[in-house]
Amino acid sequence: MAEKNYTVTGMSCAACANAVEKALNKNNDINASVNIATEKLNIEYDEKKYDFDKIRKIVESAGYGLVEDMTEDKKMELYQEKITSLKKRLILAIIFVVPLLYISMGHMLGATLPEFLNPKVYPLNFALAQFVLTLPIIYAGRDFFSHGFKNLVRKSPTMDSLIAIGATAAVLYGIYATFRIITVDPEAHMDLYYESAGTIITLILFGKLLEAKTKGQTSSAIKKLIGLQPKKAKIIENGVEKEILIEKLKVGDIVIVKPGEKIAVDGRIVEGSTSVDESMLTGESLPVNKKVGDKVVGGSINKNGSIRFEATEIGKNTVLSQIIKLVEEAQGSKAPISRMADIVAAYFVPIVIGIAIITGIAWFLSGSGLVTALSFFIAVLVIACPCALGLATPTSIMVGTGKGAENGILIKSGEALETAYKIKTVVFDKTGTITKGKPVLTDLIAYGNYDENELLKIAASVENDSEHPLAEAIVNEAKEKNIEIKPYEKFRAMPGYGIRATFEGKEVQIGNRKLMENRKINVEISQKDYDILSNEGKTPMYISIDNELAGFVAVADVIKETSKEAIEKLKKMGIKTIMLTGDNEKTAKFIAKQVGIDDVISEVLPYQKSQKVKELQEKDEFVAMVGDGINDSPALAQANVGIAIGNGTDVAIESADIVLIRNDLRDVAGAIALSKATITNIKENLFWAFFYNVLGIPFAAGIFYAFFNGPKLDPMIAAFAMSFSSVSVLGNALRLKFFKVK
């Protein structure tokens, strides 16, 4: 099964998105989801049966368009075209609706009309003038009619269908009344309803324009990220400086960046030193110092030194492109909380049409007359707003994930954003998460016939090619002391225990107490030293040669400056904290005490970490696992929410639901707080959307007028209310932009 994302065109409400989903999902081997806020189609399909053209034809059969691989520039161009088109159509409608309202209602307010339009003297002129003025307004709102009636014929009615039926009913009644003026009843000019049709279309065009503009603001985070990338870059070609388009950059090109310029792509500095502003990418406010050999990230700003760097990643492989991709995917995904709204939206429009018809018939049969029945019929149609329901969740998800990205918190899906606020227990890996992951060798104790330098040479030689941070500490110490590192043979890594290798004909083993116990090596001589160093928070590792204890080394990792504050923030939120580590119990408890962690689970092998998380979940704990994604990927995947600590460049950690780019543990609390704020915002939106429709539709149907002698809702007021219902939902979602992630 292949998974793709495409852009759907021509949608106007949640019912449209549902129609596209329905058309696609009725086919075997297709699983489709449409996000109305982003206009994105996420689809899984069998590549042997379907391709883009076949999928596009299915979407077109539902009345919509499908676009493949649309660039951001093209999206922006289409967005601006949509705004411009709506503005022109709204202006056209306003030009004609103003005189239409003046003619139809001005005389009621004492306004003077030309004699030839006097309804009492020339009722036909009065009616025909309104009819003529209504036609350009209908033209301005032509899309409502074309899309609305087409979808009605396809048995997938949308919001456009409601508008089209309501406005058409008003116009047809106006035409009927005009013929009555000609034939039998000059007094029919009293209720023409042309002004209702014209005003409904104008107000909804105005609402659509506001909605489009507001929706554009919800995706501002993506636009900011895209705006970080420069269009051109300066390279050295055959010894000559040359400016080229960024699309023409190749891996290996030497790029020149002067102070104040943006870094075009990812690379490694080969000449010069500087400080780089990465705040727009990582949320890190302070410039980061860079020198020869250091990585630079595309989209960051060179502050105060000229540098040359070799391009290592270009195009879609850059960190910036990956961040944009992750944010787009998150904004296009659906949160579980939206399912109820989606179900309601699927049946909403047909139900509203049914309610409108029943309302009209009931009022007509009650003896109130055709005009009153028509008024209630139209009011029900135009007040109903599936858009508010459809936009309630995705717009908040868009703004929430965008806000996270601006602060170095990459939330990969709407589900992760919704789930994070439920977290009650946070489990931390130690090395590289609570600590910096750059341990140093603090102690080396030799026993028997070995001296410290000889033992360090043996240990560094067999650990030289290991990627483990503890091995790196041993090798670095040997290099600092200029101790020769020699070749080894038969290297074997034993995760959770240590390593084994042959060095100069001798079997060397370096690892923890479990390794020594498994090999039945006596370590009693070292017990006192082991306890002292463990109690100081250091990690002791035994060294055996030919199955006899030769000594041990102790390695210490520095605790991150922000770890203690991060734990305090979580405790204030009522969240339990646990450290899960392969370290011995004494070392683990020492580190945990330093930062204030509640509980410790120590001496855990890498493959056991996910099982420990599962055991916590079985106790009805909602668990987040925080790690670096290196040896704790299964635990990240097992947790209800997997949170990976990045390093400013690694954002594609597959097993994580959330990636913290800044490598700052305080962002764990920030991600949870953002999730709570977003879910609260979604619930507010859903409440408003349901409350508006549940209250508005009965009000428009005349329930309060009939039974409580309440006010009667004019169709024009109903149209005004509908226009602003979706805008209010969007406006509420935009409040998240002011949320401070601390």
Language model segments and positions:
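Conserved ATP-binding TGD loop and adjacent catalytic N/P-domain core of P-type ATPases
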Residues: 2, 38, 411, 423, ...
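Membrane-embedded alpha-helical bundles of multi-pass transporters
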Residues: 109-124, 153, 172, 403, ...
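Actuator/coupling domain of P-type ATPases
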Residues: 60-76, 128-130, 134-238, 248-255, ...
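Conserved cytosolic catalytic loops of P-type ATPases
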Residues: 5, 31-49, 53, 57, ...
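Flexible metal-binding regulatory segments at protein termini and peripheral loops
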Residues: 1-125, 137, 224, 240-241, ...
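Juxtamembrane helix-loop transition segments at the membrane interface in multi-pass membrane proteins
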Residues: 149-154, 213-228, 395-414, 734-742
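Bilayer-spanning, highly hydrophobic alpha-helical transmembrane segments
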Residues: 91-99, 340-367, 377-385, 391-395, ...
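ATP-driven catalytic headpiece of P-type ATPases
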Residues: 88, 300, 424-467, 497-578, ...
